[in-house]
């Protein structure tokens, strides 16, 4: 339960998700619903509806919205290129904390408003935002609606999957000015594309277009046209959310932790997670749905 509404997050609540945010926001005299006495009525009303928007008194650079079991985190400073400063990094951390407290969520979509995802620049020191994103137990799908450079690319690397528009470019141009990545860029990039391509991008500071990014494994999908990005997102979302929530969590854990283990240790981790999964309701549902020739109805338990 939250003690107060988050200062830097706009919350679009569906059903009873983040009920603590309802109460906390109302206690701070939300512009949407003022009297705290209305809380039970509003919470009850929210059942089965599309959602109720709550706007804390202080809005900021990050938006958090919920749609059923998918949370969307949006960088919302398009006029500033969605640059990641300390304020935005703090807001991202708070959004990730809220997401981590909701066991009903199965996927996080991370994107930006405007024509870029997040670009390097500005006179203020960049904030560090990759750690809270990479620490999320559920899959994180990064939707690159435009360029991602410097700290913005480092943030994108903290996700599990990346899709982009065909016009997007990626790189670390700040290296030309002696600025070294400081939010995991030198570590996550080689783990994703391999040390050779990582050195290519880091040492030259050159920009990589969407086509090349796909070929080296920096992104997983490229929309054929900018307007088709939503369709690519919808397809991937359906595939991820339609599977076992526990299976997705364990797969993410096995890959993430396995990268830092020897092969034998990684195989032991994989075996252990399989043993745990075998005892879950989701595993039983998977077997039953196959035998009954129907689609599975996973509960995440």
Write out the residue ranges for each language-model feature.
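Conserved CoA-thioester-binding segment of acyl-CoA-metabolizing enzymes
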Residues: 6, 12, 18, 22, ...
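An acidic, glycine-rich surface segment that forms the CoA-thioester-binding/catalytic face
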Residues: 56-57, 89-93, 97-100, 107, ...
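C-terminal long alpha-helix characteristic of the crotonase
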Residues: 78, 163-168, 210, 219-268, ...
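CoA-thioester-processing core
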Residues: 133-135, 143, 149-202, 216, ...
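Acidic, divalent-metal-coordinating active-site segment for phosphoryl/phosphodiester hydrolysis
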Residues: 150, 205-212
């Amino acid at each position: 339960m939250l003690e107060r509404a988050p200062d830097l997050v706009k919350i679009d609540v569906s059903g009873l998700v983040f009920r603590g945010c309802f109460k906390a926001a109302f206690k701070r005299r939300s512009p949407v619903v003022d009297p705290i006495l209305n809380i039970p009525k509003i919470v009850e009303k929210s059942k089965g509806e599309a959602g109720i928007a709550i706007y804390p008194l202080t809005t900021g650079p990050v938006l958090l919205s919920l749609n059923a079991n998918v949370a969307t985190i949006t960088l919302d400073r398009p006029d500033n290129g969605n640059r990641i400063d300390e304020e935005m990094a703090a807001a991202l951390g708070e959004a990730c904390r809220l997401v981590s407290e909701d066991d009903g969520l199965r996927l996080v979509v991370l994107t930006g408003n405007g024509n870029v995802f997040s670009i390097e620049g500005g006179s203020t020191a960049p904030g560090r935002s990759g750690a809270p994103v990479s620490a999320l137990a559920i899959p994180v799908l990064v939707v690159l609606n435009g360029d991602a450079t410097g700290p913005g690319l480092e943030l994108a690397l903290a996700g599990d999957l990346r899709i982009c528009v065909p016009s997007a470019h990626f790189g670390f141009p700040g290296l030309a000015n002696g600025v070294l990545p400081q939010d995991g860029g030198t570590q996550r990039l080689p783990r994703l594309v391999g040390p050779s391509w990582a050195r290519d991008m880091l040492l030259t500071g050159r920009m990589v277009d969407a086509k090349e990014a796909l070929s080296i494994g920096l992104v997983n999908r490229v929309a054929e046209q900018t307007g088709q990005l939503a369709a690519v997102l919808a397809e991937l979302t359906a595939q991820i959310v339609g599977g076992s929530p526990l299976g997705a969590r364990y797969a993410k854990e096995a890959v993430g932790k396995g990268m830092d283990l020897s092969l034998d240790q990684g195989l032991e981790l994989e075996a252990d997670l399989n043993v745990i999964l075998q005892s879950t309701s989701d595993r039983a549902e998977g077997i039953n749905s196959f035998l009954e020739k129907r689609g599975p109805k996973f509960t995440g338990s």
